[in-house]
Amino acid sequence: EVMESLSPAQNVVKIVLDELIELLGSTESKLVLSNRIPNVIMLVGLQGSGKTTAAVKLAYLLKKQGRSPLLAACDVYRPAAADQLATLGGEIGVPVFRGDGEHPVDIAKGAIQEAVDHLRDVVIVDTAGRLQIDEQMMQEAVDIKKAVKPDQVLMVVDAMTGQDIVNVVSTFAERTDFDGVIISKLDGDARGGGALSVRQVTGKPIKFVSMGEKPDSLEPFYPDRMAKRILGMGDVVGIIEKAQEAADAEQLEAAERMLREGFTMNDMLDQMKAVKKMGGMKGI
């Protein structure tokens, strides 16, 4: 009876939604870490894709989960790249191994030894951004992978990358055989349609999406929510989860009081502060 009550247009939307969810992977693909200490996570991607900020956000997420991460600054080419990572790492209380003046492979290996010496259980290797046509830089990524044998290699992909994303991810998949994808800058105008290409072309799962600039803006990837976003249907569940994280015991008590006594201007101010805590209207 429910299906019969839908209009032809609604039926088409439902069919497209189901197919999109299937294309994007059906279920959440979690980050899998091994029992060895330290675990090593290596990030690769194009120049300007947002690897450094993604590395910091991933470190923050792992720290919240009870891990003790260490960031490795292996980008020796971009001016002040190590300084940027050190600054961002300091803001979230995660140390950064720089290995000033060394080769990226040596820095990555040194970071692992640093983690062993200081009881850090996860090393996140932030590599230099590269072009898929730059053979020397691509080989460097391969060399780093061979040297540190990472548990996970994650490719960071800009959500606003155009149609060339197919060639980009194909090249990286062939050379680095990455394990999963982080979609960055999804808080912009792009709805994430490029994510479809990544999953279809490589068969690699999308692990996380970055929804903003703040350290806590890295979220697990849910195919059903992304499919709804692409179709312009919004992510209601995601908004509810953000509201639950932003709400504290006092706010819950205030909500119960509002139901009993009514809504005041002070209550409106509290609600506006809560929305701001969630990242503002743009973050929602």
Name these PLM-found stretches:
Residues V76-Y77, G101, T127-G129, A159-M160, ...:
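Conserved Walker B
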Residues D121, V125, A141, M278-M281:
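Alpha-helical transmembrane segments of polytopic integral membrane proteins
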Residues V44-G45, D126, V156, S210:
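Short beta-strand segments
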Residues E1-C74, A81-G101, I107-D117, D121-V125:
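Primarily NTPase-proximal linker/entry elements flanking Walker-type ATP/GTP-binding cores
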Residues E1-L23, S29, R36-N39, D100-E102, ...:
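Non-catalytic, charged/low-complexity accessory segments that flank nucleotide-binding cores
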Residues K109-I112, R120, Q132, Q136-K146, ...:
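Conserved phosphate-handling catalytic cores of large alpha/beta enzymes
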